Regions:
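Conserved catalytic cores of very large enzyme subunits
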Residues: 1-244
Length: 244
């Protein structure tokens, strides 16, 4: 049956619907080679998922039955879930970790609004090592994640009242037995995902700070913050150096 799906996908030559291919050490080699051949067409089909990684992941995510974990399927983009028994919500929100870096550099203050949005993790004058700066960044990130979770909890509670998923709840195990809809923990399992944005930009920025401030000592952190606060006005040479 797997081989037939791969043949059909090869014949259709479309990027949707997305096909997931579960891989394990006992997989039939001919079928695996057929999946690889389809991948060579450049359509991004199929997506490969390793059972040795995903089964333990499902168990760690709350599943307490190894048989159900072995029966996992892919929902959303790459999330392994127990089909028919999970309330999976693919997008709980976004966290911009580059913005978190900006909050770190301004001691928790959002420079755009002037509001004290994050915790006070220390002024730049106090950050005399990259380790101290990273500790402050991690503290800001931890606070923002907690803030995000609280906001998501409020939104989820409101959704259960304003837009209850009654019909969908009849299709997922646990809801009828408990007399609860999905949004009120009716399903046997529940999980969601949060998108992290700005990862590459934040990594590049941290690398630039480490190199220019702490390794080469070309600028101090207070000087860098001052330059950033003025959007590099009169300091284009620093702009180019930090970019490169």
């Amino acid at each position: 049956l797997t081989y037939l799906f791969l043949e059909a996908a090869d014949g259709a030559q479309t990027t949707q619907p997305a096909i997931s291919f579960r891989y394990n050490k006992k997989i039939d080699r001919e079928t695996f080679r057929r999946a690889l051949k389809l991948t060579q067409k450049g359509l991004g089909q199929p997506a490969f998922f390793n059972d040795d990684i995903n089964i333990p992941r499902v168990l760690a995510n709350g599943c307490n039955d190894i048989r159900e974990a072995r029966d996992y399927a892919i929902e959303g983009c790459v999330e392994a879930q127990v089909p028919g028994k999970t309330d999976f919500r693919p997008v709980a929100g976004f966290i911009n970790i580059l913005k978190v870096l900006e909050l770190t550099m301004f001691n928790g203050v959002d420079p755009k609004t002037g509001r004290q949005f994050g915790p006070k993790t220390g002024t730049m004058e106090e950050m005399d090592t990259m380790e101290k700066f990273m500790d402050a960044y991690k503290a800001q990130l931890s606070y923002i994640i907690d803030y995000h979770l609280k906001a998501y909890g409020i939104c989820s509670a409101l959704h259960s009242q304003i837009c209850p998923t009654v019909f969908a709840s009849t299709l997922v195990d646990g809801c009828i037995e408990k007399g609860r809809i999905l949004q009120k923990d009716g399903a046997k399992y529940s999980s969601t995902g949060t998108f992290i944005s700005g990862v590459a930009n934040a990594a590049d920025s941290l690398a630039a700070i480490d190199q220019v401030v702490f390794r080469q000592k070309l600028l101090t952190l207070p000087e860098l913050v001052e330059i950033l606060a003025n959007n590099y006005e009169g300091h284009e040479e620093w702009h180019q150096m930090l970019l490169n």
